[in-house]
């Protein structure tokens, strides 16, 4: 087992990474203050792991709330089901909420923990690659609004993150690829040697090689933990973690939440960010193509939806958390391995990026 630390002073917490950790309650018990525990899961994950986790926490009074699965349910109505379960069971301020599932479950359970009786303890047990390398670390919680993704939420850090890598053995290949989008992101924004490693090992990752997966998760979490420790509330460097997300969130919102998986939209959105970086002369076309090839090898889309117009993108991108005083800030690559957040770009370059021929770019060879 590997243990990393998110350094936030008195609110610091560990990230445990390894095989079979669901069967090691001693990793969770020190982070549960009261006797009440509420496990939040979904209809896909609960049949696989809920009974096992409940059994390992036998010394506590445990309830579970099983939600419908999917991004389409990341809303107020589903959030209320969590509160209904907590209140019906008379859970008090010393309860601990455990998120058992992917990014949607983690975001909603964390938001519920932030809100319930003005804040209760919270534990993340992510079961998808995307949630293990990204959303479970850093304290971003929330729900979607029909007009914009993740526009309602709170920063609320967990007590501990428990990553059992064997949970990926039951993950569908499409979900695994979606998680790889966030892994690749770390190589692009802050760790070019890791990007090279990913190019050499992406096939092992897709084949669920445990050694390769564990290494990729550790390296991704270490990068995320370092950024969060330096900028918890995204006032500076943390925003670079959103490479591809402004374009990607526009895709998710326009197409309908859940039609494109988050990682799929991030992949296509990152290709758009690479294209814009190349048009600005910050990276070469060969470096742009390097990123495109890796996304393709990871089984991810690199072409945005053809039914989305430039106007569609601009409409959705105007409702983005990085918009400040009406100026759209974008995360772009100054060079491979170095991302910047900027609103200093010619409008015509953004328009050209939105109108680029991504189908032609997707045909590149080599």
UniProtKB/Swiss-Prot annotation:
It catalyses: 7-phospho-2-dehydro-3-deoxy-D-arabino-heptonate = 3-dehydroquinate + phosphate. Pfam families: DHQ_synthase, DHQS_C. Its main location: cytoplasm. One of its GO terms (molecular function) is 3-dehydroquinate synthase activity. Keywords: Amino-acid biosynthesis, Aromatic amino acid biosynthesis, Cobalt, Cytoplasm, Lyase, Metal-binding, NAD, Nucleotide-binding, Zinc. Pathway: Metabolic intermediate biosynthesis; chorismate biosynthesis; chorismate from D-erythrose 4-phosphate and phosphoenolpyruvate: step 2/7. CDD domains: DHQS. The keyword Metal-binding applies. Its cofactor is Co(2+); Zn(2+); NAD(+). Zn(2+) binds at residues 182, 245, 262. InterPro entries: Dehydroquinate_synthase, DHQ_synth_AroB, DHQ_synth_fam, DHQS/DOIS_N, DHQS_C. GO terms for cellular component: cytoplasm. Binds 1 divalent metal cation per subunit. Can use either Co(2+) or Zn(2+). It is found in: Cytoplasm. One of its GO terms (biological process) is amino acid biosynthetic process. NAD(+) binds at residues 69-74, 103-107, 127-128, 140, 149. Its EC number is 4.2.3.4. Belongs to the sugar phosphate cyclases superfamily. Dehydroquinate synthase family. Catalyzes the conversion of 3-deoxy-D-arabino-heptulosonate 7-phosphate (DAHP) to dehydroquinate (DHQ). This is 3-dehydroquinate synthase. It comes from Pseudomonas fluorescens (strain ATCC BAA-477 / NRRL B-23932 / Pf-5). The lineage of its organism: Bacteria, Pseudomonadati, Pseudomonadota, Gammaproteobacteria, Pseudomonadales.
């Amino acid at each position: 087992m590997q243990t990393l630390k998110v350094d936030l002073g008195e609110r610091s917490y560990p990230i445990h990474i390894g095989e079979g950790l669901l069967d090691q309650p001693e990793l969770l018990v020190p982070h549960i203050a009261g006797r009440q525990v509420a496990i939040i899961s979904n209809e896909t994950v609960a049949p696989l792991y809920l009974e096992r986790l409940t059994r390992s926490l036998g010394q506590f009074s445990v309830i579970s709330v099983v939600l419908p699965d999917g991004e389409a349910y990341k809303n107020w109505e589903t959030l209320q089901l969590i509160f209904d379960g907590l209140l019906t069971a008379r859970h008090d301020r010393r309860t601990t909420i455990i998120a058992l599932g992917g990014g949607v479950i983690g975001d909603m359970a964390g938001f519920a923990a932030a809100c319930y009786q003005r804040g209760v303890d919270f534990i993340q047990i992510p079961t998808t690659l995307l949630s293990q390398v990204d959303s479970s670390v850093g304290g971003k919680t929330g729900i979607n609004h029909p007009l914009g993704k993740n526009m309602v939420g709170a920063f609320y850090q967990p007590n501990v993150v428990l990553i059992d890598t064997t949970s990926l053995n039951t993950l569908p290949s499409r979900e695994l690829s979606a998680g790889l989008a966030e892994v690749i992101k770390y190589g692009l924004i802050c760790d070019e040697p890791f990007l090279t490693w990913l190019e050499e090992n992406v096939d092992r990752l897709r084949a669920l090689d445990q050694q390769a997966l564990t290494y990729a998760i550790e390296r991704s979490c270490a990068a995320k933990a370092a950024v969060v420790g330096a900028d918890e509330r995204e006032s500076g460097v943390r925003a670079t973690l959103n490479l591809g997300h402004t374009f990607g969130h526009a895709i998710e919102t326009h197409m309908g939440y859940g039609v494109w998986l988050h990682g799929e939209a991030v992949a296509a959105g990152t290709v758009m960010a690479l294209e814009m970086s190349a048009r600005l002369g910050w990276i070469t076309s060969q470096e742009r193509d390097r990123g495109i090839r890796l996304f393709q090898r990871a089984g991810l889309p690199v072409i945005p939806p053809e039914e989305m117009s430039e106007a569609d993108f601009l409409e959705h991108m105007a409702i983005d958390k990085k918009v400040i005083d009406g100026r759209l800030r974008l995360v772009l690559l100054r060079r491979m391995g170095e991302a910047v957040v900027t609103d200093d770009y010619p409008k015509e370059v953004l328009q050209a990026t939105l109108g680029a021929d991504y189908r032609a770019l997707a045909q590149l060879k080599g």
